[in-house]
Design a protein with these regions (language model features):
Chain A
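Polyanion-binding surfaces on beta-sheet-dominated domains and ring/shell assemblies
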Residues: 1-378
Length: 378, 1030
């Protein structure tokens, strides 16, 4: 348990024998048509149940449950806060209007993740929350291109600015309800996405630089991520083009790129990547926000010993059976069927393939966003 | 990717739970989303006596009783609803016609919805409170129906439905439910009782239209009222606010700037650019007001209508300081609204400018003055009203300005607009639309202000009721009581039920075993007596003194034990806490407690045993207090003296009985105590008080009833011991209740309050006033003596008193201990303990003291009695401070009215004999204005404004009629020297020395006092006229 606690990576390895690992690896790395243990296609996600607005006291909330029983709840609360101008801005006088006051500040979004069995300062929750927060506050819409919504100029950070002296502070509380059976990042990210979609802020009644004053009617509260006009919604286009980012977990096994990996699949992955995407233009093109590599747990697995090197098996097999072959994905020599821990490193073309699969029109990213949009917010 | 949403529709409980979601902004700037869950129920009764279903399902209390049903089984019918009807008013109907709902002639059997009540609370707290008290009374049969909690009538807000629409829908839903419910119940009962109609009253046209579609009977308020008898009178009572807005359509010329939005005001207030305070109009000049704000130690001036921006005296306003070039000095001119705006026509809106020519002229002259070089008239910061926090509007007593009714006033029932002149000069005239203008002339009437729009020069209000003919005793007394918000209705039955059942036969129990004797000391053998004004019935206090064996004396103050009869939190206690104090008018007393207690059971009448709360001291012959003791007791007063009789008895050397001796001792001690108090720096203040002894016969001169208060030694005897008792009790109570003790403080007045007076004294008399401490002030006041003018000292004391703040009740936790100080009495701590019959504060202090000394009450478990939470206590303090002040004002106004009436009676008598020459008296100039002076007449305790025309110049006949004198004003000029406080009045073009009159501040002048009828526009009004004759 202690070593699990320290884990910052996806290293909750299932206890699989080297032979099992090797079997998994081989079937997943079959060129073009990997065979996944649960029979999914490489880009297929596991089914999930999702609902939003489950916590009436929050500004926005969502729950997502995966079929394997893992569940997460996210609640978003917003609070009005005075913008503290930094001393150097004050010193610089009139001209130096604080950038924080106009374009927002990343620290205005706070995220806390609670995972059963982990303390809140353990590496895993801290790493996860920082990874998700980073893409949230990093998603900046260029105001100049004309396609972006005026309200979302400056991204989430900009949306939180009320006026030069006041801003919203957003608290995102993520609660994983079950033991982390697989690496929880996709679940938490999707739930957070959904919760942010349903988040509303009270309607501002004051104007300009006045102290903020809000309408007391919750019905007229406005979405944090504004909806497009109804017209667009009915015409079948995405009703909302600025979306909170989604972080997807992608693994590569051999040349294959596999989405929504299960625990076993992660255990044999060559590389584990967290890819954050968002959509911020009307055209609906996805935008890549960040890619982070995650320490692959396959690194820590026990290696298997080829028969040729096994003293017990000496002479029992033909030497031709375990001739080392060059693995095309990693460029290393391996004996087929004999598990060797992955040493990390992934080919440029594989990563390019991953990103392409996520970002392309009709790709995985779009599919995920559409799927989440299908969850009726309200 | 597939996602599935959890389905809730299969949950059978879902429909029973609803929630109410709203956003709450807290004072600290937090914004919270609040969710309240509602669990809908089906056992909320319809409360109609017709219903046969609800009695079986209505929830019952612990004894199995259900709340009695309210709505009558035979509700009144109208022409339109012959079978009777229940009313379901919408919020806007209540906003526009609360006075109608309170009217006793109509509007019975009303169903008030919870939705409506809450909406009303958000819109108008005073109306909400009035509605609550209506619901509480049984006569009007108002039923509060909790429609939001009942499953059938709860309405869920539809998507994109506004709150307003949703609430309107809720009202209609209730109406149709009632209809259905009563119909079903009638069918089930098989009784052929006819089902009353359910009538929704709403002023929302959209809602009426929708009601028609939903087959719900809905009428607008005015349509409904038109169908009632006496509709003309009732129609006048509908508020003008909504109507005016509707009918006008395009808004005409906007006279006033718009108020800032709430958020703008809040931003400004927090940033310190704007200030908040109560708008206070000057009694001498209706165009000048001041607002005291915490940021500055002097009040800010607000000059003119533009700057006052529709604020009315008493409103809580937000103001902005004007640039320095617009600062002005306070006006030195008397400006009456009546005089300046005499010719305004209430109907014409178009021609009027917000500042009329006359007003502008009046202002200009002030500005000129402000730019003068003198020190006192130095320009002061001025401000303008930019926002309104809270209106302080109430109901105003006034009369219809006969000049504004138009020629055809008497002729018809046509609705016309008239001006109502409020009695309170600080309130502007109110424009009222009425159909009964002809009838209302010459009546005291009650009106209220509904709105003051930007395009209207005067506020708009509506008529509520008539109090009766002007100048009749009943009408004027009621007017006074209403104006000072005195509760004068008879005590309701619930209060009288709290009285002891024995009534006047109640006696102190004979057997000492009786529980009434628990914790009481038997002091019946002490020689106790009471000293009060003549004819006093509610005797609060009695005294005794006796020599102890050790050479010291025991002195006792015995106070009526009111807290024995008034138990905390019963109906009587609540009523008393609302009334706060007994109000004494010349010929009427409005009691705080029912008659039975005040004048009999509690009153320490002589020769009978009474419960008392006693404070006993052991004092040395030099009046040093050795120890003090508090106890509940039983006493028997030996005698009830009046001040005069007590004085006579003490002075009579032939009286040597023990009682007299004891009084002599008391007098001796009181003199020592008094001296000690003055040595400590207590102030001897003066207020212009006269006493009216109204019981003399009719034949004599009524003016002989008017007496200035004589100060006998016996007065101060009682006063000294009451002060001592109050101080002793205060420290005891504070010891036990460091947070919740009810105390009384008199804040040290800021020195700048005295600036004017100091200036005036040094200029005119070369005297100095040291205001550094109360002691210094006391001794410097003693030095302000004019050997030729014995009244001068009193005059200065009166003026000094006006510079001070008023004393107030507070709860110990509200201030730091050094702030407890009573400035006037120079005591570090003070409270009121000695008059529980007539002051609620004393009653509370009694309870606190009882608890402090461990008195357990009759049944032994009333240890902590009364109020023990600070918040509640602070509410009570606020109320009793307010009531206390109002009672004083009402008392003074009553005396003033009486003096006026006495003068009038005298005048009429004299007129019968040929001449009405008024009465010659001495007066003193209190204030000098540019166009008049304020004169104080000690004989009658009145002060009055003397205008230009009321100066009798040498060689001129003194007695002229009012109208003749008014003519004079235009021919006169004045020379006013604000630095020297002098005014010279003379005929235009005749500046010879001997043809004019000079007056100066503090000057003694001969005046002629008479009561005159105002003529012309102010017909029917009467004022005391003071002529300066030399």
């Amino acid at each position: 348990m202690s070593n699990q606690r320290q884990a910052s990576s996806a290293s909750q390895t299932p206890h699989l024998s080297p032979a099992e690992l090797s079997y998994l690896y081989t079937s997943l790395s079959l060129p073009k048509s990997p065979i996944r243990p649960d029979g999914r296609s490489p880009t297929q996600f596991r089914p999930l149940t999702a609902e939003s607005n489950i916590l009436p006291g929050t500004n926005g909330s969502a729950r997502i449950g995966f079929a394997d029983g893992t569940q997460a709840i996210v609640g978003v609360k917003a609070e009005v806060e005075k913008t503290v101008l930094s001393t150097d801005t004050l010193a610089s006088g009139e001209g130096g209007e604080s950038t924080a006051a106009t374009s927002g500040h990343g620290s205005w979004v706070q995220m806390s993740i609670e995972i059963p069995g982990f303390r809140d300062d353990d590496a895993l929750p801290v790493f996860l929350s920082e990874m998700m927060r980073e893409s949230l506050v990093g998603a900046v819409v260029e105001g100049g291109d004309g396609g972006g919504d005026v309200m979302m100029a400056g991204g989430l950070k900009g949306r939180l600015v009320i006026n030069k002296r006041w801003h919203w502070r957003l608290y995102i509380d993520v609660l994983l309800l079950s033991q982390p059976l697989s690496y929880p990042l996709p679940l938490l990210s999707l739930t957070t996405h959904l919760a942010l979609l349903s988040t509303k802020l009270p309607k501002l009644k004051s104007q300009g630089e006045e102290d903020p004053f809000f309408d007391d009617d919750w019905e007229v509260a406005e979405y944090l991520y504004p909806r497009g006009s109804k017209l667009k919604a009915t015409s079948g286009l995405a009703s909302q083009y600025v979306r909170p980012p989604v972080t997807l977990l992608v693994v590569s096994v051999g040349e294959n790129v596999i989405f929504d990996p299960s625990r076993e699949e992660i255990a044999v992955a060559d590389a584990v990547l967290a890819i954050s995407v968002t959509r911020d233009t009307e055209a609906g093109n996805l935008k890549l926000l960040s890619i982070r590599t995650i320490d692959p747990p396959s690194r820590l697995t026990q290696p298997a010993v080829p028969n040729s090197e096994n003293v017990n098996m000496l002479g029992a097999t033909a030497p031709t059976e375990d001739i080392a072959v060059l693995n095309p994905a990693t460029g290393e020599e391996e004996v087929p069927g004999v598990w060797r821990p992955r040493r990390g490193g992934v080919k440029r073309s594989v990563i390019a393939n991953m990103i392409k699969t996520v970002l392309k029109k009709g790709g995985v990213g779009e599919e995920v966003l559409e799927g989440l949009e299908g969850v009726e917010v309200e | 990717m597939k996602s599935l949403r959890r389905d809730l529709s299969s949950n059978p409980q879902a429909s029973n739970v609803a929630s109410k979601v709203f956003v709450r902004s807290t004072k600290s700037g937090k914004v919270q989303k609040i969710v309240r869950e509602l669990y809908l129920r089906q056992d909320i009764p319809c409360s109609s006596k017709l219903c046969s279903l609800c009695p079986s399902i209505a929830p019952s209390d612990a004894n199995g009783n259900i709340a009695p049903f309210v709505l009558s089984d035979r509700p009144a019918g109208t022409k339109a609803f012959p079978r009777g009807h229940y009313l379901v008013p919408d919020t806007n109907a209540l906003l526009n016609g609360m006075d109608l709902f309170e009217h006793t002639g109509a509007f019975y059997d009303v169903i008030i919805l919870q939705t409506v009540l809450e909406e009303l609370r958000n819109q108008s707290l005073p109306l909400y409170n009035r509605l609550l008290s209506l619901i509480k009374t049984d006569e009007k049969r108002f039923y509060l129906f909790f429609n939001e909690f009942r499953l059938e009538t709860h309405v869920r807000r539809g998507p994109e439905e506004s709150i307003n629409d949703r609430n309107d829908r809720a009202v209609r839903a209730v109406a149709s439910w009632y209809e259905e419910h009563l119909g079903a119940s009638a069918k089930k009962g098989k009784k052929e009782k006819s089902v009353p109609a359910i009538v929704v009253i709403t002023d929302d046209k959209g809602s009426i239209k929708k009601a028609k579609a939903e087959k719900v009977t809905a009428l607008s308020l005015s349509d409904y009222v038109s169908g009632l008898e006496d509709s003309e009178k009732l129609l006048d009572m509908i508020s003008e606010a909504r109507e005016a807005r509707d009918s006008k359509g395009p808004i005409g010329q906007l006279f006033y700037p718009e108020y800032l939005s709430m958020s703008k005001m809040m931003t400004g207030l927090r940033a310190g650019n704007l200030h908040q305070g109560t708008f206070n109009v000057s009694p001498y000049n209706y165009l000048e007001a001041s607002v005291k704000v915490p940021a500055f130690n002097r009040p800010l001036l607000i000059l003119g209508r533009d700057n006052s921006n529709r604020a009315i005296s008493g409103d809580m306003v937000v103001i902005e300081v004007l640039p320095q070039d617009q600062w002005k000095s306070p006006s030195t001119k008397i400006v009456d609204e009546e005089a300046v705006t005499r010719n305004d026509n209430p109907d014409s809106e178009e021609t009027e400018a917000v500042v009329s020519q006359n007003e502008r002229k009046a202002l200009q002259e002030e500005v000129k003055k402000a730019h003068g070089k003198n020190a006192e008239g130095k320009p002061q910061p001025t401000a303008r009203v930019v926002g309104m926090i809270k209106r302080g509007w109430r109901q105003y007593v006034g009369h219809v300005d006969a000049g504004s009714t138009g020629s055809q006033a008497a002729s018809g029932r046509r609705q016309q607009t008239v001006f109502v002149l409020p009695m309170d000069k600080k309130v502007p005239k109110i424009r009222v639309r009425t159909r009964q203008a002809g009838d209302l002339i010459g009546q005291r009437i009650l009106v209220t202000i509904d709105t003051w729009d930007r395009d209207s020069r005067y506020p708009t209000g509506h008529f509520i009721r008539s109090l009766g003919e002007l100048e009749t005793k009943g009408a004027e007394t009621e007017a006074l009581l209403l104006e000072y918000d005195v509760q004068y209705k008879p005590f309701p039955k619930s209060v009288l039920d709290c009285l002891p059942s024995e009534g006047h036969d109640w006696k102190v129990p004979v057997s000492k075993e009786d529980k009434g004797w628990n914790g009481r000391r038997d002091l019946r053998d002490l020689l106790i007596c009471s000293i009060d004004p003549p004819g006093c019935q509610d005797i609060d206090d009695a005294l005794h003194a006796r020599k102890l064996p050790n050479g010291n004396f025991e002195v006792g103050v015995h106070i009526a034990d009111v807290s024995h009869f008034v138990k905390p939190n019963n109906a009587m206690d609540l009523e008393a806490s609302v009334r706060g104090t007994t109000v004494y008018l010349v010929d009427k007393r409005i009691d705080m407690l029912p008659h039975l207690l005040g004048t009999d059971l509690c009153s320490l009448k002589p020769y009978v045993e009474r419960y008392a709360f006693s404070v006993l001291w052991e004092v040395t012959p030099n009046a040093e207090i050795v120890k003090s003791d508090f106890t509940k007791s039983v006493i028997r007063s030996r005698e009830a003296f009046s001040y005069e009789r007590a004085q006579l008895r003490i002075d009579d050397p032939s009286q040597t009985d023990e009682l007299t001796e004891s009084m002599r001792n008391l007098l001796k001690f009181s003199k020592i105590l008094r001296q000690k108090r003055y040595d400590a720096g207590a102030l001897n203040l003066a207020s212009p008080e006269v006493r009216i002894e109204a019981d003399s016969d009719e034949v004599g001169d009524p003016l002989t009833d008017v007496k200035t208060k004589a100060m006998l030694d016996t007065n101060s005897l009682v006063e000294e011991f009451m002060l001592l008792a109050n101080i002793t009790v205060a420290s005891k109570v504070f010891d036990s209740f460091s947070q919740t003790a009810l105390l009384r403080r008199h804040a040290t007045p800021p020195p700048q309050n005295f600036e004017d007076l100091i200036n005036q004294l040094s200029k005119k008399r070369g005297m100095e006033l040291d205001v550094s401490s109360s002691g210094a002030l006391a001794s410097s006041l003693d030095r302000c003596v004019d050997p030729e003018n014995p009244f001068f000292n009193t005059l200065v004391r009166i003026l000094a008193t006006r510079c001070m703040t008023s004393a107030e009740y507070f709860c110990a936790g509200a201030h730091a201990e050094p702030e407890f100080r009573h400035y006037g009495l120079a005591s570090p701590i003070y409270t009121h303990f000695t008059s529980p019959i007539r002051r609620y504060a004393d009653l509370l202090v009694h309870r606190q003291l009882a608890s402090a000394i461990g008195y357990e009450g009759e049944d032994g478990h009333a240890v902590i009695e009364g109020v023990n939470t600070r918040g509640k206590l602070e509410d009570i303090c606020r109320n009793i401070n307010f009531r206390h002040r109002n009672a004083q004002f009402a008392g003074r106004a009553s005396i003033e009215y009486y003096v006026g009436q006495a003068l009038k009676a005298r005048g009429e008598k004299m007129a019968a004999g040929g001449t009405d020459s008024g009465i010659d008296e001495e007066g003193y100039v209190m204030r000098v204005f540019e166009n008049g002076v304020v004169v104080f007449v000690p004989r009658f305790g009145i002060e009055g404004v003397v205008r230009l025309e009321d100066f009798v110049l040498p060689g001129e006949a003194g007695s002229r009629s009012v109208s003749e004198r008014r003519e004079l004003a235009v021919h006169r000029t004045t020379h006013f020297d604000p630095e020297e406080y002098t005014l010279r009045v003379e005929e235009k073009g005749h500046s010879e020395k001997e043809r004019g009159v000079d007056v100066e501040l503090f000057q003694r002048v001969k005046v002629n006092v008479s009561s005159v009828k105002e003529e012309g526009r102010g017909a029917g009004k009467r004022r005391v006229r003071i002529l300066i004759t030399g």
